[in-house]
Amino acid sequence: MRIENIGFIGLGAMGSVMAPLLGKSGYNVLGYDIGSKIEKSTGVSQVQSLNDLKNMDVIIFMLPNSKIVAQVINELLDINTKSILIDMSSSDPRETKQLGKTLQDKGINFLDAPVSGGVSRAKTGNLMIMAGGKLEHIKIVKNLLSVMGKVQFAGPLGSGHAIKALNNYVSAAGLIASFEALATARSFGIEPENFLKIINGATGKNNTTEVKLDKFVVSEKFNSGFALDLMVKDVSIANSLVKDLTTKNPLSKSVSHYLSKTLEELGGNPDHTEVYKVLLKN
C-alpha cells in the first residue's frame, strides 16, 4: 500500500510540530482542529470539516483523551471507512481495545502509537513512538511514523497506550523523588550544580536529573512544554492499570494522589515542573 495522503486531527502543542514534519517529507497533509490554526507554509493545509478527510490513506489523531478520539472517529465513520487510523494521543488502553473491536467489525485498521519526548523532540523528529496493533499494519505505516521519531513495536492493540501511561508514571515518580532530593540537598548547603554532578554520576540519575532540573527548575523557567494536567491524566491511567492487576499499588496510588492535589493547589494550567514550587512552599 502506497501512503501519500495524511489526515492529521489535533494541531495543538504536539500536533502543530508533528504534522509539519510529514508535510516537509513529501506527504500531502491535511490538518484539522476546531480550536487551533496552522499556517500553510508549514507544509500542512488546514481544512474546516472532517468531510475533507474522506480520501486519506492514513488519519492520525493527536487529541486530549480517549473519549474525544472515539467521538471524532464516530463522526468519521459516516464519511470514511478506508483509512488506516492511528491514535497517537495519550489514551486509555482499555478504551483503545474496546474501540478497536468496534472498528475491526467494520473492517477498519486501527493502531495506537503514542509518543514520548515532548515538544522539543517532536520538533526534531526524535520522539519515541510506542506502536501497538497488528504487526503487519504497523509495517505499512512504519516509514510514515519514522519521520516523527523512532518506532518501537510494543505489542497488540492497546499496548502502546499502556506502556505510555506506565512510562509517564515511572517518570513522574522519578520527578517527585528528584525534586524532594534537590530541596533537601539545598538545606544541607549543597549547590544545585554540585547536586546534579553527583547524582548524574551515581545511581540516582534519571530523566529529571539529567534533563529537567537544570533547564527548567534551577533556572526557574518552569517551561518544559508538558502541562501538569496531562501528567496527572497519564499517571491516573497507569494507577488504574496497576490496580486492575493488583490491589497492592501503594506507590502508583501515592504518586497519582500527590500530583492531583498539587494540580488543584497550583490552579490554572501549570507546567509539570512547577510541582517543585508546591514542594518548597509546603
Regions of interest found by a model, annotated:
Residues 1-54, 58-61, 152:
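NAD(P)+-binding Rossmann beta1-loop-alpha1 motif at the extreme N-terminus of oxidoreductases
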Residues 29, 46, 109-111, 152, ...:
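Hydrophobic beta-strand scaffold residues
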Residues 50-108:
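Rossmann-fold NAD(P) dinucleotide-binding segment
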Residues 63, 90-169:
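Rossmann-fold dinucleotide-binding core
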Residues 124-131, 157-188, 200-212, 230-233:
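Active-site-proximal catalytic alpha-helix in oxidoreductases
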Residues 157, 211-272:
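Interdomain hinge/lid region at the active-site interface
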Residues 193-201, 253-257:
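Beta-strand segments within the central parallel beta-sheet cores of soluble alpha/beta enzyme folds
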